C-alpha cells in the first residue's frame, strides 16, 4: 500500500531543526517513520508515562488513586539541592492552583495533568509515584530511548544533567500499548485512553483531522519545542497512532501547523475498511 501523503510530508519537512514522525496502526509495522528514535526534550509528553505509572502503582497496591494529598508548591529537587517552586504563570491549568491548601485525590491530579497539562498536578503526582516507577512503566512498553528523571521546572536538576527525553517511536509504543491493554491492566488502559480523549488543548494533531474525530492524545510544548502523540479513532477505519516531535527555531504557530499537517497526511493515508 502507498502512503503517498505521509511520504510527501516527510520530504517537505524543514532542513533546519529536528523533526520526527511515527505513523501506523495499533498493531503491526509502521506506515511511515522518520528519525523516530531521535531524542527530543519531552516537555509535557512525560506526563503520559507518569499517569500510566500511577495506574500501574495502584494495580500493584503501592498507592491508592483515591488517596488524597495536600496541594502545595514546594518540591524537592531531583538533584538533591534546595527545594523549588513552580511559576503559576507558566501553567496552563488554574484549577490545582485554586486548591492550594486543600486535599485532592491522586486520580484528580492524573486527570488534570493530561486534560489541561497541569504542571502543579504533575509534580504533586510525581512526588507520590516516583521517577523509578515512571521509568518502569516506560520500559514495560519497550520504550528504551526515553528518560523521565525529574519534575517540571526543576532547574537545579536540569543544570545537573537530569533531563526528560522522549522519541516519537517510544511515544508510539506507549500509545499502542494503551490501546492493546498492555501498558497497564486493561481497565486502567481504557480509563487512561478516556482521559487522553478528554484533553482540552487541541491545537496540534486534532487540528489536522476532520472535526468531531475522536482523538486520545498528549501534547507538549516549551519554547522551540512542540510535540503531539495521538491515538486516532476514525469511523471508517481501525484506530491508528500518529506522533510528531519537533525541536526547532520555528515559532509556536508554525510548529503546531507542522504537526497538524502530519496528522492530516496520516488521515489521508489511513487504510479504510
Tell me what each language-model feature is.
Residues 2-16, 30-31, 173-203, 219-273:
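Structured C-terminal helix/loop/strand segments within mature extracytoplasmic catalytic/sensor domains
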Residues 16-20, 102, 122-175, 179:
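Mid-domain, small-residue-enriched loop/turn segments at the edges of structured enzyme/sensor domains
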Residues 52-60, 127, 173-180, 268:
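Short glycine/serine- and small hydrophobic-enriched flexible loop segments
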Residues 29, 41-69, 242:
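Active-site SXXK
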Residues 65-82, 129:
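Acidic helix-start/capping segments at beta-turn-to-alpha-helix junctions
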Residues 15-39:
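Short, conserved catalytic-motif segment at the N-terminal edge
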